[in-house]
Design a protein with these regions (language model features):
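A short, Trp-centered hydrophobic/proline-enriched beta-strand micro-motif
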Residues: 42-62
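Flexible, surface-exposed loop/linker segments and immediately adjacent secondary-structure boundaries
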Residues: 100-139
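Gly/Pro-enriched, hydrophobic low-complexity segments
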Residues: 125-193
Length: 193
């Protein structure tokens, strides 16, 4: 009988130790995420402009170019392709310009993913209200789903906390991946939007 009680006490001690370790681990993760969230929000708050090179992939088609972004809601991207394509947002409208074909397509910014991506306050609220959907050794990913069930995934470099790009679907339901390279924060942008 004594051996049986000793065995149960041993099991209880091990179980208690196990739950204590799990509790400490979860607490450390929450503290770590809180610091990460605070640092990411501070980085975004301090950012006024961004300039960067990009690689955009729509299904299997890749395009490259460079962009200038000025918060809130202003962006100008020049694609390095034969169509001489540009995307410009003036804060109200997004214009896709194809100089080679002399065509311009206009969209209200509110119906595009740019309304979230180019609005720093919306991104900060997304970070405050949501946990990342993924954190790996390189990236932190957040997901935003609007009222119409459109998804935008925004990602940041885990170490530098710099904006690294986004993923969404275009108006034809094609997967769009936009990756940022050679990012420069708070540089003087001389171009008018």
């Amino acid at each position: 009988m004594w051996e049986k009680g000793k065995f149960y006490r041993s099991i209880l001690k091990k179980t208690y130790f196990f739950f204590k370790v799990i509790f400490i681990y979860i607490s450390l993760i929450n503290i770590s995420f809180a610091n990460l969230e605070k640092n990411l929000i501070n980085k975004l708050t301090a950012t006024k402009t961004l300039s960067f090179d990009f690689k955009q992939k729509i299904d299997e088609k890749e395009e490259i170019g460079n962009c200038f972004l000025k918060y809130p809601l202003l962006i100008k991207c020049n694609y390095k392709n034969l169509k001489q394509k540009s995307i410009i947002s003036n804060g109200k409208t997004v214009a896709i310009i194809k100089k080679k074909y002399k065509k311009i397509y206009y969209y209200p910014i509110k119906i595009t993913p740019f309304f979230l991506i180019l609005n720093k306050e919306k991104v900060i609220n997304l970070i405050r209200k949501n946990k990342p959907i993924e954190v790996n050794s390189n990236l932190i990913r957040f997901e935003f789903i609007d009222k119409k069930k459109n998804k935008v995934k925004i990602f940041f470099d885990k170490n530098s906390l710099e904006f690294k790009g986004w993923e969404t679907k275009d108006s034809y339901s094609n997967d769009v991946s936009f990756t940022i390279n050679n990012l420069k924060n708070n540089t003087q942008i001389v171009d008018n939007f």
